[in-house]
Amino acid sequence: MRTENEYKGSNPTTSKMDQSQTSAFFEVQGKVKDFSYAGSVGMTRAWFKESEEDHAYYTFTPTVRLSYNLKKAGFLRYRFNISPAIPSLGSLTDVEQAMDTIQIVRGNPLLKTYQQFTNSLSYSYSKKQFNANLSVRHQYYDNPIMESIFVEDGKLILKDENQRSFQSLNTELMAGINGATLFGLKDFLTLYASGGYTRSWSEGLNYSHMYDEFYYSVMAQVQYKG
């Protein structure tokens, strides 16, 4: 695949890039009584070339899924996976683009791919029309690509760089009833409510941020069949 980008301005530039990607994948799964398991692994090679410079990225993508049937007490599920993030063609381009009189977006051919690690654990329970689910998820990005902003020769430079890390922790609870009979009307009401909390940490090359978020939602639906 080939992409061609033309940047116009005081210094017009044409950037041409070639790209190819090759992947292989393998999966195995099984079950022992109430315990189920599955595992998969993939390997991907991504290649980019601009002018005389080329970059090759190799990514490893394993996934593990486990589940246990607690029968009347519900289901317990666990999932772990590693997924790669490859720099975009636009970020790799060795080009400066003026956004206005003071802001310049600068490409970075030295960007490296990074890994995203995700662990998730969930418990679900249902009885008749009642359903509930509790989940916990943790994500960790190792040397993620995030924007750096700095001043150079009186200009504000915006540049993607591999930073130190990013991680988030999320907990969410959902509960509701589906098709409940109300006022003698069968399957009249469906009601669900959910709420959660997320904490995120960003560790840059010369900065750090922490962000907390609480959220909730309520969904109600009534249905009448004459």
Predicted regions mapped to residue ranges:
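A short, compositionally biased micro-patch
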Residues: 69-71, 114
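Transmembrane beta-strands of outer-membrane beta-barrel pores
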Residues: 2, 32-34, 43-49, 56, ...
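Membrane-embedded beta-strand positions in outer-membrane beta-barrel channels/transporters
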Residues: 21-27, 61-63, 77, 108, ...
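Outer-membrane beta-barrel translocator domains and adjoining extracellular loop/strand segments
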Residues: 2-13, 49-57, 89-97, 102-104, ...
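Outer membrane beta-barrel strand-and-loop segments of large Gram-negative receptors
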Residues: 112, 131-223
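Repeated loop/turn-to-beta-strand initiation elements of outer-membrane beta-barrel proteins
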Residues: 34-39, 72-76, 129-132, 181-191, ...
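Surface-exposed extracellular loop regions of Gram-negative outer-membrane beta-barrel proteins
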Residues: 17-53, 57-67, 188-197, 216-226
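Outer-membrane beta-barrel signature, preferentially recognizing the C-terminal barrel domain
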Residues: 17, 84-133, 140, 158-174, ...
